[in-house]
Amino acid sequence: MENYTAPEWSRSALITIDTQCDTLDGQPFEIAGTTAILPRMKSLLAAFRSTGRPIIHIVRIYRADGSNVDLCRKELVQKGARLVLAGSPGCQLAPDLLPHDEILLDEGLLLSHGIQTIGDNEVVIYKPRWGAFYNTPLEQYLGKLEISTLVFCGCNFPNCPRTSIYEASERDFRVVLADDAVSGLYDQGRVEMRNIGVELLSASQVSAAVRR
């Protein structure tokens, strides 16, 4: 019998979520555990780059006037909180994620829902809300590449990774969560992911599978 949720590694892509400078230790929007997962995220990126598999970095970018900010954070930003603000260093991808130095986000392109290429088969997409698929070109991009399997890693499982995984599941993607390369993961979250067919693997297990 076919396992409909088993990863198809030859048709897989890696998705990093919101791993931007402001989320790292000591920064204005610090998310506990995000700096600690960077080495394992780097290992995943190395595996996907070495095999030519697609990589998509999903980011948040807030305008300083708060015009594109979620309602739950709008007042915070309008009062001067510096959270992944357009034009700020904190908005940039964490340096450990970059394929080479001196890459800066093209905020104009991204905010207009364009796709920024930063390497071979490696792009950045802006998402305006929690989910990576909501009002973004992600699904169309993955469809053109005939991707069936998505590997998720990155910042703050309860919010954006979790939402993005549910969105991927409802679009019938096979989903893998690199459970030691995502911050904020908790025991009940693991149970809930398995309950919807998500495969939980370590970064080293994913890397080995991609390289086979």
Protein language model annotation of sequence segments:
Residues 1-13, 42-50:
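Short amphipathic alpha-helices and their capping/turn segments at secondary-structure boundaries
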Residues 27-34:
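Short glycine-enriched, charge-decorated loop/helix-capping segments at active-site entrances
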Residues 39-145:
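Active-site alpha/beta core segments
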Residues 149-158, 172-187:
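A short glycine-rich beta-strand->turn/loop micro-motif centered on a GG-aromatic cluster
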Residues 161-171:
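Short Gly/Thr/Asp-enriched flexible loops that form oxyanion-binding sites at enzyme active sites
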Residues 184-199:
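Active-site-proximal loop->helix
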Residues 200-212:
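A charged, well-structured terminal subsegment
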